[in-house]
Amino acid sequence: MEKQGLFSALCYLMLNTPLLFSVNATFTEVPKDVTIREGEDIEMPCAFRASGSTSFSLEIQWWYLKEATREMAQELAISAPGNRNKVTTSKDATKISTVRVQGNDISHRLRLSNVKKQDEGVYECRVSDFGDDETQEHKAQAMLRVISRFSPPDMQAAEAVSHIQSSGPRRNNPSSRATPEPGNKRAVPPAENLAPSLSTAASSSASPAPGKAAILRQQHGSGTGPIFANDPALYMFLLIFHQLVYLLLNH
């Protein structure tokens, strides 16, 4: 009984050991979206590992899809047995290259030299896993964007700085701001503040209008400005008062 149990356990391990080392079919390296300038070179990687430890036939095809709709980065499509080439292909799709190997691992890099603007589009790596009973199709896509060789660098940062400066608090015009001269602590008054003073001085130095009398004090050391009188009686009174004061001061 003991030998029979050991024999059964050994048979179980022999039958299930391959399953312990089997892994799911997956991409080990996929192409990524990239942006380059015209005239540059680029490589797009694509590597795949099949499931199980049994040797299969694997095939990689690189396709160029000009106006294809972006799909999932990795997609698994199982076709019916016997229909190995049942793959949905866009009308604008163009096959670039094909590589086929015997085994569980396959890899193929797409190399593009001297890229031009018309090379822009979606590039798709298709892997066909040919098994005994069915064929599995795996796909990985990447977008290639090509910019002009003479295009300026990205200006978003500069535009953001310009936007911040323009949206900041507005200050007075530097021409109207009081700016002290070197060595002079007194600030120069703004231009708009000088305008009323100049107009006042001009009006005070102008001759009086008709009907108005001006009495100028001629006392020594007196810096008093002109005094205007509109009433004739008041004018005579001030004139007499001025003469009396002058006589008193001289005596």
Curated annotation (Swiss-Prot):
<dbReference type="GO" id="GO:0016020">
    <property type="term" value="C:membrane"/>
</dbReference>
<keyword id="KW-1015">Disulfide bond</keyword>
<dbReference type="InterPro" id="IPR013106">
    <property type="entry name" value="Ig_V-set"/>
</dbReference>
<feature type="domain" description="Ig-like V-type">
    <location>
        <begin position="26"/>
        <end position="142"/>
    </location>
</feature>
<feature type="signal peptide">
    <location>
        <begin position="1"/>
        <end position="25"/>
    </location>
</feature>
<keyword id="KW-0812">Transmembrane</keyword>
<feature type="topological domain" description="Cytoplasmic">
    <location>
        <begin position="248"/>
        <end position="251"/>
    </location>
</feature>
<feature type="compositionally biased region" description="Low complexity">
    <location>
        <begin position="166"/>
        <end position="177"/>
    </location>
</feature>
<dbReference type="InterPro" id="IPR007110">
    <property type="entry name" value="Ig-like_dom"/>
</dbReference>
<keyword id="KW-1133">Transmembrane helix</keyword>
<dbReference type="Pfam" id="PF07686">
    <property type="entry name" value="V-set"/>
</dbReference>
<keyword id="KW-0393">Immunoglobulin domain</keyword>
<dbReference type="InterPro" id="IPR036179">
    <property type="entry name" value="Ig-like_dom_sf"/>
</dbReference>
<dbReference type="InterPro" id="IPR051102">
    <property type="entry name" value="IgSF_V-set/TM_domain"/>
</dbReference>
<feature type="disulfide bond">
    <location>
        <begin position="46"/>
        <end position="125"/>
    </location>
</feature>
<keyword id="KW-0472">Membrane</keyword>
<keyword id="KW-0732">Signal</keyword>
<dbReference type="InterPro" id="IPR003599">
    <property type="entry name" value="Ig_sub"/>
</dbReference>
<feature type="topological domain" description="Extracellular">
    <location>
        <begin position="26"/>
        <end position="226"/>
    </location>
</feature>
<dbReference type="InterPro" id="IPR013783">
    <property type="entry name" value="Ig-like_fold"/>
</dbReference>
<feature type="region of interest" description="Disordered">
    <location>
        <begin position="157"/>
        <end position="213"/>
    </location>
</feature>
<feature type="transmembrane region" description="Helical">
    <location>
        <begin position="227"/>
        <end position="247"/>
    </location>
</feature>
<protein>
    <recommendedName>
        <fullName>V-set and transmembrane domain-containing protein 2B</fullName>
    </recommendedName>
</protein>
<feature type="compositionally biased region" description="Low complexity">
    <location>
        <begin position="195"/>
        <end position="213"/>
    </location>
</feature>
